[in-house]
Amino acid sequence: MADFQVVVGDDDGTAYSFEVDGQDANRFIGRAIGETVDGDAVGLPGYELEITGGSDQSGRPMHGDINGAETAAILSEGGVGFNPTVDGERKRVTVRGAEVSEDTRQINASIVSRGEQSIDDLLGGEDDE
């Protein structure tokens, strides 16, 4: 059974962290970066979330250009998984595909549409940053 930590980013820069397992975690499996998920999966009824990235149990980031959920070694000029320090620098990095699988441990998401209640009201006035 899969379990994830879902980090939901708000427009104002606030991040909320949720532990998701069981049936709610199954809503994320098979989804790819850029797809939307119902906010009920993390306890935000009426909200819609877009998957923006994530990482696996080894800390490898999800890369939107890699299909599937497998790992791949790519020659990167910058972006996800590598920040060059010199102009023209390239490096081979191992990244995870864009699809959420049971190997995924953290999922990053952003809010696409809001529900009736604010997040603070749904969480009881606390933010889990």
Swiss-Prot record:
Pfam families, A to Z: Ribosomal_S6e (PF01092)
Alphabetically ordered keywords of this record: Ribonucleoprotein, Ribosomal protein
InterPro entries reported in the protein's UniProt record: Ribosomal_eS6, Ribosomal_eS6_arc, Ribosomal_eS6_CS
PROSITE patterns xref list: RIBOSOMAL_S6E (PS00578)
Alphabetized GO MF terms: structural constituent of ribosome
Family designation: Belongs to the eukaryotic ribosomal protein eS6 family.
A biological process from GO: translation
Presence of keyword Ribonucleoprotein: yes
Organism the protein comes from: Natronomonas pharaonis (strain ATCC 35678 / DSM 2160 / CIP 103997 / JCM 8858 / NBRC 14720 / NCIMB 2260 / Gabara)
Region (Disordered): 106-129
Protein's name in the database: Small ribosomal subunit protein eS6
Single GO cellular component term: ribonucleoprotein complex
Keyword Amino-acid biosynthesis set for record: no
